[in-house]
């Protein structure tokens, strides 16, 4: 019975804040000017409070979540045939060198190596890193 009550309880203000932040990030992650500060302004809260609440509910930092959204977009763009630079720019990254380092750090290969893997094994597009 306690579990049933917990499921029907209205969301807390903090979880609503995080849900609003996640929805905004998902809708605007390609904006190169999107920052934790601009997200905090959008949600009418401080950067510190937003960062703490976000990490508590998602187990990930705002920056990490945004980076992952952008990387997923970039991988889809590369798989669709975009150049690495175009995929980087279309994904909201502002620094190409930083993007390359982050991609390699997350996936263990460069974006060009990823593209080459896709060309060799197109049936693995959705199962690659």
Regions found by a protein language model. Give the residues of each.
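Pre-recognition alpha-helix immediately N-terminal to the DNA-recognition helix
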Residues: 16-24, 66, 70-73
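Compositionally biased regions
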Residues: 13-16, 99, 128
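Short, basic, alpha-helical segments at the C-terminal edge of helix-turn-helix-like DNA-binding modules
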Residues: 66-75, 113-127
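Basic/polar phosphate-binding segments, predominantly the helix-turn-helix DNA-binding elements
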Residues: 36-69, 88-113
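An amphipathic alpha-helical interaction segment
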Residues: 1-9, 13-16, 20-23, 41, ...
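Basic, amphipathic alpha-helical hairpins
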Residues: 1-7, 20-34, 54, 58, ...
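Short, solvent-exposed loop/helix junctions and linker helices
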Residues: 11-15, 33, 81, 93
